[in-house]
Structure formats: structure tokens, C-alpha cells
Amino acid sequence: NFHNTLSRYIKRLWPVITVQEWDPKVKSHTVLVGGVYYSDKDEDFEKCIELTFVYNPSIKKLKIGTRKFRTICGVIADTILHEIIHMRQYRRRGFKMLPEYASSASSSKVREEQIYLGCTDEIDAYGFNIACELLEKFRGNWKESIKFLNCDLKNTRIRGGCWKMYLKAFKHDHDHEIIKRLKKKVIRYLPRAEDGKPFKSRDWICH
């Protein structure tokens, strides 16, 4: 069983909870990966990072090639590191919540997305994810990675991962305060992304 085997391996490396879900909208022989950090569980010294794997219910046997499997593993690592950054954020400030970003978007859907992505915690966590994505995209070339951050990706089919997600949410406005803050965060995280971990210290997943 793919899910059980993968879950067992992940739990050997990280103290996380794994959840299996089914959705007919998921493409055949594909796995969607999501993650969440629970600050209340963390404060009570319980396992606080949850990974969710979503599969198509019509597929009895999952067929995944080497290339797709590597992609899935990359997404899992990015997701766990994203949530570990959130864990560190909450622990450092004594589990206090931060105020939400005040979006002025007229559309409720856009406003909801901007409130989520505009949060200081998300800018920090996605900053690391984007730094990793860019170094992978440009094979470790910092100059090309930074150059890409200043490109106009509107009306293009260029894959931009989380960076393009932010640009879309904030109307591809490179002068927007959130986009400018995120750019600085990404550049600051490049050396850490090169090491493959968001922090220098080794105790970033321990109390």
C-alpha cells in the first residue's frame, strides 16, 4: 500500500500526523499533498504538524513513475518545511497570534486569498519555499533566481510555482507592499535554501 509505506517512512524522519483522503476531482495516478500546523497541539506538547494525502477513489492501484515520485517527495519536503517554519514562529513568540493582513480587494475570493498570503507568517514560510523553487529551477544560480523575481509573468505560461501564486493574488503588482516584502524574504532565504533547511540550528523541530 503506497500510502502506508510512505507514511511509515515519513514518520521515521519527522514527528508528524498523516491523513488519507479521497476526492474524485484528483487526477488518476496523482497524489495531492497538503499540510497544516496546529499551535494549540504544539503548546500541549502533542504532534502538531499534519500531512494530508488526497487520492482518486476510483484508483485501486497507484501507478507512479520515478519522475512523478521524485516530484511528490519534493512537495512533501516543501510542505513539512513550510509547517516547521510556522512551528518555529509560534514557539518564538509564545504561541501568540498575529493580526491579519487588511486586504482592500472588492472580490471576497481575492480578499480571502490576500488575507491568507499577506500574513507575515505566510510571507516568511513561502519565502523559503520560493527560494527553494527558484534554486531548483535555475540549478543553484542566484543571479538568475533574483532576475526571475523581477520578471513580468502576467499573461505568460511560464511556471512560477508559489511566486506566481502570490503575483496572481496581488494583481502582478511588483510595487505592492506584500510583493516587495516577499521578494526581500526570498533573497534572504537563498543561502538557507541552498543548504536545504530554513534554519542554521539543528534543534528547529525540537522543544
Predicted regions and their residues:
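Post-HEXXH active-site segment of zinc metalloproteases
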Residues: 74, 90-118
